[in-house]
Swiss-Prot record:
Organism lineage: Eukaryota, Amoebozoa, Evosea, Eumycetozoa, Dictyostelia
Entry protein name: Copine-E
Names of required cofactors: Ca(2+)
Binding site for Ca(2+) 2: 80, 145, 147, 153
GO annotation, biological process: cellular response to calcium ion
One Pfam family cited in the UniProt record for this chain: Copine
InterPro entries: C2_dom, C2_domain_sf, C2B_Copine, Copine, Copine_C, VWF_A, vWFA_dom_sf
GO molecular function: calcium-dependent phospholipid binding; metal ion binding; protein serine/threonine kinase activity
One cellular component (GO) term of this entry: cytosol
Location of the VWFA domain: 345-552
Primary gene name: cpnE
Binding-site list for Ca(2+) 1: 80, 86, 145, 147
Domain C2: 45-175, 183-304
Species the sequence originates in: Dictyostelium discoideum
Amino acid sequence: MSDSSIVNLSKEGDSNFSSATINLSKVDDTVNVSNATINLSKVTIDPSNQMSNPSNQGINLSKCTKVELRFKCMNLKDMDTFSKSDPQIFVYEKKGNNNNNNNSKPILIGSTEMISNNLNPVFKKTVTIDYHFERIQNLKFEVLDIDGGGKNDTIGDFSITLGNIISKPGKKVIGEIKCNGKQTGTIEIIAEEIQETGQNIILKLQGSKLDKKDLFSSDPFFKIFKSSANGNLLVYQSPVIKSNINPIYNPIIFKLEEFNGGDMFRELTFEFWDYDTIGDNDFIGSFKTTTDEILKGQVREFTLINPKKLSKSSYKNSGKIVFTDARLIAQPTFIDYLSGGCEINLMIAIDCTASNGMPSDRTSLHYNTPTHESEYARSILAVGNVLAPYDSDGKIELLGFGAERFGGVTSHCFQFGPKAEARGIEEVLSTYNKVIPTIKLSYPTNFQEIIKHAHKKSIKGVDSKNQKYTILLILTDGEITDMEETIEEIVKASSKAPLSIVIVGVGIASFELMKKLDGDENQLSDKNGVIATRDIVQFVPFKKYENDPEQLAAETLCEIPEQLIGYMKSQNYFPNMKN
């Protein structure tokens, strides 16, 4: 540090100041603040100076930018015996300034799709990440061979900072995938900044008189590409429509920034192909356009051209494509769905296993008196009081699991109390207090049946016009013994059910398995390698927030809005008109 120092001052909002006293001293390389006075009337504040210390935490140093990452791999090591590998890329971010910082766990940011039997895969699904210029963002790209029959095999991984990708020409990096120090393939990563628009685009395409590539017809599908400095980038590939030269495709919905990067005049290419089970697919034809042209409707019908046929005098085109629907809609919010009539249903499941202790015992987690509320009772109140107002009819299904029932058989899903449903949290609590002393606690602790029950009930009568969403609140004191079966049920529900599962851990157990079910650090997958399409589980230990019920509720329920929106989008359900 020199004898003269520069002090940067910033002013936020409408704060007024005229002078400040700052105490400065220096010991070795440490600057201590002690005594200095600055007359602010003689200080010029440059509003363009945004520089600050990147190590300062809790301060938003710059607005983050959304960056889309897309991938392809080359010459992957074949991990299978009788076929080629089925690769999938998982992207992790490790917090901290050093890749060797072992104190921080990598966080799963996203993943690509799995591509079957391919050692040179080009992935369609991208991963979007927030880019902070002022932070070092260490990324790890793990390439797995997805094994449908058991444990996935690691092909290898590649690590780099996001800043290094962004700074490369064309924002493109090619790196070596390694496993145990040996190269097992090559990965290409292309980054693209995307402008958030808050808009979705809906497209519906219909074909007419496409070329017959097979004996009597074609099996057409299409691909959408957006132009970039690195060539055309694949945005979407449609399902195949069998034996139809006049195909009508289901509507497709994109975030506008994913579709065109927020640029309405960016060139788009639509390619149509004939699918062949054996051999290469046959090119039918293509056309180029822009989002602006599609939406304005100046041209809604496009001609497919195959350049190889242009030299033929009799050639006119290879078919026509019409956009029967093309429009922008705002990205829906949680409140939009609620305002449109989406019903929220609450289910509460209570752990009745012997590990809780007899309810009459003062050390029991179920010991509950007017002067001593049990952790179960306090959890019901804290979380239930937030959720209950959203429950459309006020009826809350109350379940139990892990108790001995009729004939001495342990039930892992049963009606808790004389009625299947309670009206409001007060009745839930009243029923709990009356019934728990009469329950014969048993073992083991299993979740599968409870989740299966919630899954089946949540999907009844749900469609785009009758939107419903169920929240299953599970209160438990320990680890489960049916982990594999529970994961399988969660994975099934993640793709099919309008369901979120909230788990509150009661007591002092480690809850390591509950943390795994949460899926925040590692994407949940079942024994067959099937990966959960949505993160639908949130776990919170009660002890951490027992003196702050509001924070307990906030931590427990913070992911629900995004989980509901994620399900609705996966089903192409948009908010209904407000009543």
